[in-house]
């Protein structure tokens, strides 16, 4: 996926959730990440080809895989698409037989996120308070 398309989708999904990590990355670093082998990206599209959401996995520490980003654009939320996208993406990742697939979340995540993660098989491993990055 081209950087401009990725960032447009990242912004559309992530703005309400205060996502900013990829926006802070230098362009060359993001280009390398998008072109590299360690990033697996699953994009949900409607029949016209418009991106409705995505799952992004970091396989750089395989056999552990981290779910780095997951979400839907606001107009696609509440229609059951999130659980379907996550389940489909996880099926793809489990095919490579990782030891585990994990994620971390925070209080800025979508209110339904934790229940979606739990229904997909994720369980709480650790909870901690961390200082927030200044805006």
For each of these PLM feature ranges, what is it?
Residues 69-72, 78-93, 114-119:
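Conserved acetyl-CoA-binding loop-helix of GNAT-fold acetyltransferases
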Residues 93-105:
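Conserved GNAT acetyl-CoA-binding A-motif
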Residues 118-135:
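Active-site/acyl-donor-binding loops of N-acyltransferases
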Residues 77, 103-113, 130-135:
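Conserved beta-strand-loop-alpha-helix junction that forms the acyl-donor binding cleft
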